[in-house]
């Protein structure tokens, strides 16, 4: 159960899929994943329920939104950025480019990459603004 006084002060959204069901954003991998994960196999109603942008209001916490130049979900970030702007939610948006090679989906999890360190340091700096 969620504590009544819980207040999320900031969130990070990294290399994510934020909107489901857009025909132009649909791909076989995502469609198959939704069929497996959602009880009714990814009906339009279920897809609407998992759309992040459905839940963005002016009360949404500040966002660190990140993707990478070769992330297969890269087109999702600008869609969410548009919603954040419309709702006047404070956010930082970064699309990372590699210093030595092209960066792909969730590159920031590879701690051996200097580019991952750069991304994670920036994300930590973002959160420091919201720590007491």
List the model feature ranges, each with a label.
Residues 1-132:
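Alpha/beta-hydrolase superfamily serine-hydrolase fold, recognizing
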């Amino acid at each position: 159960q969620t504590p009544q006084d819980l207040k999320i002060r900031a969130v990070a959204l990294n290399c994510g899929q934020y909107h489901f069901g857009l025909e132009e954003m649909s791909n076989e991998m995502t469609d198959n994943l939704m069929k497996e994960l959602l009880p009714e196999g990814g009906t339009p109603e279920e897809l609407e329920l998992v759309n992040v942008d459905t839940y963005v209001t002016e009360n949404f916490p500040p966002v660190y939104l990140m993707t990478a130049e070769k992330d297969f979900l890269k087109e999702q970030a600008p869609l969410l950025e548009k919603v954040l702007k419309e709702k006047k939610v404070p956010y930082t948006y970064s699309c990372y480019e590699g210093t030595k090679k092209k960066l792909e989906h969730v590159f920031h999890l590879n701690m051996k990459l200097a580019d991952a360190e750069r991304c994670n340091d920036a994300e930590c700096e973002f959160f420091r603004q919201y720590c007491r």
